[in-house]
Amino acid sequence: GHYSRATEINPENVKNLKKVWTHRSGDYHQGANWTEDVTPNSSQQTSFQATPLLVNETLYYCTPYNRVFALDSETGEEKWIFDPEVEIEQKALLHCRGVGSWIDDNKSEEDKCYHRIITGTIDAELFSIDGKTGELCKDFGNNGSVDLRAGLGDHNPAFYYSVSPPAIIGDLIIIGGGIADNISTSVPGGVVRAYDIRSGELVWYWDPIPPGQEPILDDSGRQLYQRGTTNVWSIISTDPELNLIYLPTGNTAADNYGGHRNGSDYYSSSVVAL
């Protein structure tokens, strides 16, 4: 549930609420119960997990196919639709938990990308969208998107994704990623990255390497994101007043069995504050 300060709706009268409108995206897949066979090669199923975001008079939400809808909050009428045209090959469960929202105080309401909607995808891209028009903000990354696979090394594309809403603090986007569970310990690492919300440039990253372990370097001496580390697939929280970011970590690969982790699960199942 979600806390609300609304006083006109209370435990006594909530039963009297009437449905005003319904919106259907059409983005779903029919088939067997997805919980029976969740592997990268199983039949693709959809799960609607998004919490709509209300900004002024517009509702924003994402679908299991990672399309983003902007709706009139009073009528449910579609204002625009953004389609990232995700690659769903070998993805077992298609879903999206929400989008991020940011207002650029350096711009006026008439300027392009004064209001930005930020969203990650199941094929590991990060998009910046104009909240008014649904068009990409071309000054962000590569014509509006950032490749989240950068620095992860060779891996099966089905094993890495980012479908929880990006967290935003100041002018930074904070984003983690999820991996395919119960497959292998040789999967992309759980790095959490911060990107400049205007340019899409990488500002910093947190690689959850356990204390005492040395980072892995490439031939040029740059640190690589260590494979198989604890990831942050869920929803990140921020506290602008304290300038803190709270990361809810999951289990280190391969999820429910820890016998092959070799100490890489130091940050597993924890809350980490950065």
Q: What would you call each of these model-derived segments?
A:
Residues G1-S43, S47, E77-V86, E135-H155, ...:
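Aromatic (tryptophan-biased) beta-strands that constitute blades/sheets of beta-rich domains
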Residues Q44-R67, A92-E125, A158-S184, V191, ...:
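Repeat-blade elements of multi-bladed beta-propeller folds
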Residues S164, G190-V191, D196, G212, ...:
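Active-site cavity-forming subdomains of large catalytic enzyme subunits
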Residues H2-S4, A32-T35, P64, L71-E74, ...:
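Short, solvent-exposed loop/turn and secondary-structure capping segments
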Residues P11-V14, S73, G131, I197, ...:
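Inter-blade boundary loops/turns of WD-repeat beta-propellers
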Residues I129-G134, P188-L202, R261-L274:
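Beta-propeller blade signature
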Residues N56, T63, D72-T75, F82, ...:
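Generic hydrophobic/packing signal
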